[in-house]
């Protein structure tokens, strides 16, 4: 009898826990995805803060020349970063217990792998949590679909690209200057500015910013007049009021006269779908571009493609970009390679008689 009562209380406790986890009445919705999201993001954030402040230098290139990234080792907020895991580790799973000591784990950049893997799992769970809350409220799933774009971008630079290149040392450093360094090296090695998917991503991000600014300014400019012509149109309104204050028909008419009729939307749902879909599609393409360049399917190469009747090269802008790429590649990993790979791969020219 006692065992039956204990089992019933245990089942009742589990049921109450499930109800609390999935309740939409909580101030912050947790959900089953949140059960995994909370510990993974807390772990990633905690280790990031500690490592950014105090992590020792990391042998990123695997050549016994450690690179300092933390504040206590001479960096500031701009130059500081979590240095990627050493090339000596490659793509191996490298938790603390795989190293001979904590000092060795830190020297080989173990915190980077720990942070990145927990972070990616956490943001994926955040996306799942968005879908879960939408489902429980009877909403459609497009919020999670929109969030999949930055999740795909983060996964591309932190996981797909290192896998394609064969080492976590090729992942993006976790810091401001580290991000810019990653971008410069990426351009040098993959000519990303000449990749059509990157161009679509730029159009998505900048176009999305433009459309958001246009939409916001139109909405805040087209008031439903509640006053006479002798009074200010702003009279009678207060900031943050619940009642609708703008007229989409008026905004549509204004924009149609400013550009042309069919450049504007007269349907609010179509307009907001477009505002969401444009940047999301662009960022999806960028993530896809990073993933293809991970396998060295690089941007267009028009180097030395224009020649005169004598076969002499007429330099174009593509050749200028190529020269800049070689210069950036020379600066990158200057102690690990004598020459950029582009030069080292070319057979030496015999100058003997």
Swiss-Prot record:
Pfam families: Photo_RC. One of its GO terms (biological process) is photosynthetic electron transport in photosystem II. The modification Phosphothreonine is found at residue 2. It is an enzyme of class 1 (oxidoreductase). It comes from the Eukaryota. GO terms for molecular function: chlorophyll binding; electron transporter, transferring electrons within the cyclic electron transport pathway of photosynthesis activity; iron ion binding; oxidoreductase activity, acting on diphenols and related substances as donors, oxygen as acceptor; oxygen evolving activity. It catalyses: 2 a plastoquinone + 4 hnu + 2 H2O = 2 a plastoquinol + O2. Chlorophyll a ChlzD1 binds at residue 118. Keywords: Acetylation, Calcium, Chlorophyll, Chloroplast, Chromophore, Electron transport, Herbicide resistance, Iron, Magnesium, Manganese, Membrane, Metal-binding, Oxidoreductase, Phosphoprotein, Photosynthesis, Photosystem II, Plastid, Thylakoid, Transmembrane, Transmembrane helix, Transport. It is found in: Plastid, Chloroplast thylakoid membrane. The record marks 190 as: Stabilizes free radical intermediate. Pheophytin a binds at residue 126. The record marks 161 as: Tyrosine radical intermediate. Its EC number is 1.10.3.9. The modification N-acetylthreonine is found at residue 2. Chlorophyll a PD1 binds at residue 198. Belongs to the reaction center PufL/M/PsbA/D family. 2 of the reaction center chlorophylls (ChlD1 and ChlD2) are entirely coordinated by water. NCBIfam families: psbA. This is Photosystem II protein D1. It comes from Picea abies.
